[in-house]
C-alpha cells in the first residue's frame, strides 16, 4: 500500500474554485488554528475544514479513500487537510497520534503495520515506540554474557582434559605393572602390591574411568559447539537487522517470512513423527536385547516375572468401574463429594499457575544455565585437585614435584575465590530456582490428583451427565502480539528436546560441603592423605569427590538426601512430601484405581495435610472438613488415601477404609491396579483365592452391615423384602442405657405412603430379625423405585436414626432372588441426620392419607391458576440433585413427621417443596412463591418441630447443579396422591429418565442450568453454550456492552527482530531434529545388527548406558497411560502459565522476559542422542595416547574453532554488504498488490549453513520478469534464504 494510485484527472470534474483572497485568508486562519491546537493539544476533525481548491475525494475498488489533485493531475492517499489536523513530527504527537504522512493499517495474517506515505514504505514496528532499540541492547548484553559462559565451558574442557591425562597416565602405569608382574616400583598400597586380583580390579576401574572421562569430554565438546552455533546465529540476526534501512522489514517481506515459517513448521511436524517411530523401534530393540541377556535356564522365571510382560489379576474381579460397586444413594453422594474435591483441586491448580507466572520474572532467563556451568567448573577443579592430591610424589622428580605443588596451590586459590563469588552472586538466584522447583512439584502433584479425580468421576456411571472441561479457560494460547498461526510456545518450547536438568542447588551444596571440609583440614593442619585412590575413596565421606566417581555432564548427581542434613543449610522438603493433596473426606469406597507410579508417595507432614486451609475455601469444603473431624472422633487418625485400591466385589464398600500403607502388597508391584480384601463373607471372590485372607485380621473397626433378601413374584405382582439380620450395629451408635433397642424400617421411595418395620431387639452386635414383608407393586413402577432401609435406635419413647442403606431397584433383576450383605452408612457422616423425638408410627397410614387429600385439593387450585412456575422447576432440580438424593433418610424423616401432624395442619405444595429446595433461586422467584402460599392455621408443637427441622435442612443443601441421571421421576409432595398427572411433558422429548416411566404422568420443568433441556422459559439473555465450565453463572447472565467486549490492540507489536528470531529458531529446531533423526537411525541400525548377531557387548551397552535408558524411557509404551496423560497436562499447563504471564505485562509495556527467553533459546542445550563408542572395552595391551598427542588434538580443535569463527564472521560481513548493495541498486519499493507475492523456495539452502563455514549462501534470485514497457506494474518476488531470511 505504499505506492500512490496514478490516475489521469482530465476526465474528472474539478472542484469549484475559491476566490484568491478568500483562499489566502482561509489559509491564514487555518494556520492560526493549527498553532492554537499545538499549544492547547486540541483535536480537530477533517469535517471542520473543507478541501483545498482543486482537490476531490474518490474511493478505490477495495473501498479505500484516496484524493485527487486536479491542479497537478496526481492522486495520493494523503488527505491534504492532514497538515492542519495532525502533528508535523513525532515530537508534537500527543497520546497515540501519528504525524502527517503516517497511517496505521491492518492485515489479517500479519496484524497491525504502519505506512509512511512520504517515504512510500511500510514497516511492522510502531514508529512511536522505542522497543526496537531496547531489544537491540538486550541482544548485545546477552551476547556478552554468553561469551563469558562460553569461556567457562572452554575452561571446563581444559580442566577435564587434564583429568583425562592423569587417568590415562594411571592406567598406563597399572597396565605396565600387570604386564611385567612386578610390584617393586608400584605406587599403590601394600595390599594391592602383592595381590594380583586387586591389581586387576584397579586396572578395570582405571579403564572405566578413562572411558567415562572421554565420554564427558565429548559431551563438553558438543556443548561448546552448540553454544557457538547459537551465538553465531544471534550475531547474524543482529547484523542482518542493522543492515536494513531503519532496521525494519516491509510487509511483503514479513508475509514471505511468515510463509516460510509455516513451511518449516510442517517439516518439523513430519520430522517429529519420524523421530517418534524411531524411538519406538529403539524401545523394542532394547527390550529384545534385555531378554537376550537373561540366561536360558531362567527363561521360565522370565516368563513368569518379566518386567515387560506384566500379569494383572485385577481384571478378574473388575466390575464396570467404581460407580458400579455402589448403590444409588451412595454413588450419588460419592459423586457429589468427588465433584467438590475436583473443583477445589482446579482452584489450587489455578493458584499455582498464578504463583509460577509471578515467579518467572524473578529468575533471569539463561542465568540458571550460566550458574550451572560455573558450579560445574568449580567441581571439575575440585576433582582435579583431588586427583593431584592422590599422586604419590616419591617416584617423581624435583621439577615434577614443584609443578604439582604449584598447580595444587593455584587450584586452591581459584576455588577459594570461586566459593566467595558464588556465595555472594548466585545464592539468591538458587533460592528462587529452588522455590520455582518446589512450585513445579506441587503443580505436578496437583495435576496428578486432578487426573485421578477425573477418572473417578467418569467411572461412577455411564449415565452420568458430569462434563469435565479439559480445555483452559484462559482463551487462545497464541500470543496476542502475533497474528501468525505459530505461537510463542509452538516455536520456543520443545518438551522432547529439553533434557532433564542437573540439580543446581544440589551441586552448590556439594561444593560448599567440600569447601567446608577443606577449611577444616586447614584449621586442624591435617596433611593430605596420599595413597591409592580406591582406598582413599573408602576413607572419605559419603560425598565422593575422588577421581573414581567423576560427575557426568549429562547424568544428574545423587540426591541431597544421601548427605547429612545437619551439615547443610535448611532446605525445603521434597516435592512429593511438601504438597499433601486436600485430605479426602470419609468415603463410601475409595474406588479409584491406583497407578503403579503413584501408589507409594512419601509421607506428608502434618502442616502440609492441612494445606487446604491456605486456600480460598467455600462452605462446601468446610462441610467436608467437618466430616473429617467426625471421622477423627472415631479414633481413625490414618488419612484416607486418594488413590485407594479398587474393591469391586463389595456390595457396599467400606466407610472406614484402611490406610494405604496397610493395603499395599509386595506381590502386587507389577499389577496395574491393587485389589483390597472382600468385605462380605458371602462374596464369591472372597472364597476364590483372589484376595488375601490375612487382611481380614488387620487391626480395624468392623463395619455395620445388614443382610437383605429381595425377590419379585411376577404372577402376583409383589416384591418380597426379607430383613434377615444385622452385624456390629455398635459401630453406628453406642447405647446410652440398658433398655435401648434397635429395629429396621424400610420403604420404597419415592412416593411411599407406608413403611414396613421389624421387631425391636436389644442386641446391637448380631441381631437376628428374620422378618419378611410383601409389597404389592407393578414391575414398571418397581424399576423406578429405590429401597431405603433405615436403622433406628429406640430408648424409651425417643427414637433416633443411626444409619441407612439405599438400594436402587433399577439394578434389581426381577428374574432372580438375591440375599446380600450391605454396608450401613452412619448418620454421623450425613449432615442432615439429627435426633428427633417421634412419638409413634402406628397411625402413619391414616395421617398420610389426610395430608395427601389436603395437598391434592390445594394442588388442583394451584394448577388452575398457573400452569408452570419456577417453583416447580426448583423443586424438581433440588429433589433430583445429587446431595438431595443422597440424603434420602431425611426425606423419610419428613414423611414420618408429616404422618403425625394433626388434621388442621394444611401445608401447600409450594411451601413444603420450597423449604426442601437448596435455596438457590433469586429474590424475585422467592417473592412469587410467597404470593402463592395459602393461609394456614396455627401449628402444634409437632409442626414447629417440622419448621425447625426444615430450616436446618435448608442450610445443608449446597449442590447448585441439576442432575438428570435419575432412574425415577422426581419426588414431590403432591405425588403422594394416587391420581394420575395427565399434563403433557414440558421438557425436551429427547430426555428419557427411564424407559419404564410413562410420559403421560411425567412432568419435569427445569430452568436452573445451562443444559439443552433446561433452558429459561422466558427470553434467555445469553446465548447457549454446550459444555459450559460454570453453568450456574449463566442463569441470569447480562450481556456485556460492546465497548467492553471489543478487543483493544494496546500491546507492543512484533518487531522485525522478533520475526527474524522466530524464523531462525524454526530453522535451528529443524537442523537439530534432522541431526537427531540421523543419529537415531544410526543407533537403530547398530543395535539391530547387534540384536540379530546376539552381540553381548552391544547388549551390555544398551542396558547399562544411563543416557540411552533416559532416551528410550520417553517413548516406552510400557509406561502407564496415566503418566503419559500427566505429561500432556504438564505441557498444556506450561502454555497456560505463559499466557498468564503475558496478561501480567502492563498495556503498552514491552515483554522483556519473553524476549530474553527467545534469545536464550539458541544457546540452550537440548536432549542429546547417545553415540555408540568405537570400542566397548579396551584391550589389556593397548597403549593409550600420550600427552603430546592429546595436546596436538586440543590444538587442532582450537584452530578449527577459531577458523570457524573467523570464517563465519567474514561470511556474515560479506553477505551483509552484498545485501546492502542489492538494496541500494534496486531503488524501488514493492507495490501493493491484491494477491500475495509468490515465494520461490531455495532448493540448495540448508539449516546448518549459519554455523558451517564452508556452506555457501544462496544468492538471491528474481523469479519475476521485469518489464520495461510497464514500469507501473513492476513487482519484485522474494527468495527465502534459510539462514538470512528474505532477500530482494
UniProtKB/Swiss-Prot annotation:
The C2 domain, residue ranges: 702-822
Molecular function per GO: kinase binding; molecular adaptor activity
A GO CC annotation given for this chain: cytoplasmic side of apical plasma membrane
Biased composition (Low complexity): 1-15, 28-40, 534-552, 565-581, 872-884, 1233-1265
Coiled-coil intervals, chain numbering: 143-170, 197-232, 333-461
Localization: Cytoplasm; Apical cell membrane
Keyword Phosphoprotein tagged: yes
Residue stretches of biased makeup (Basic and acidic residues): 1267-1277
Compositionally skewed regions (Acidic residues) per UniProt: 911-931
Matching Pfam families: C2, WW
GO biological process per UniProt: border follicle cell migration; negative regulation of glial cell proliferation; negative regulation of organ growth; positive regulation of apoptotic process; positive regulation of hippo signaling; R8 cell development; R8 cell fate specification; regulation of DNA-templated transcription
Domain WW stretches: 49-82, 96-129
UniProtKB keywords: Cell membrane, Coiled coil, Cytoplasm, Membrane, Phosphoprotein, Repeat, Transcription, Transcription regulation
Main location: cytoplasm
Protein's UniProt keywords contain ATP-binding: no
SMART domains reported in the protein's UniProt record: C2, WW
Disordered as annotated region, ranges: 1-55, 515-584, 856-888, 905-942, 964-994, 1213-1277
Domain of life: Eukaryota
Ranges that cross the membrane: none
Subunit structure: Forms a complex with Mer and Ex. Interacts (via domain WW 1) with Ex (via RXPPXY motif). Interacts with Mer, Sav, Hpo and Wts.
Protein family (similarity comment): Belongs to the WWC family. KIBRA subfamily.
Function: Regulator of the Hippo/SWH (Sav/Wts/Hpo) signaling pathway, a signaling pathway that plays a pivotal role in organ size control and tumor suppression by restricting proliferation and promoting apoptosis. The core of this pathway is composed of a kinase cascade wherein Hippo (Hpo), in complex with its regulatory protein Salvador (Sav), phosphorylates and activates Warts (Wts) in complex with its regulatory protein Mats, which in turn phosphorylates and inactivates the Yorkie (Yki) oncoprotein. Kibra acts synergistically along with Ex and Mer to regulate the Hippo signaling pathway.
PANTHER family recorded: BOMB/KIRA PROTEINS (PTHR14791), PROTEIN KIBRA (PTHR14791:SF29)
Protein name: Protein kibra
Native species: Drosophila willistoni
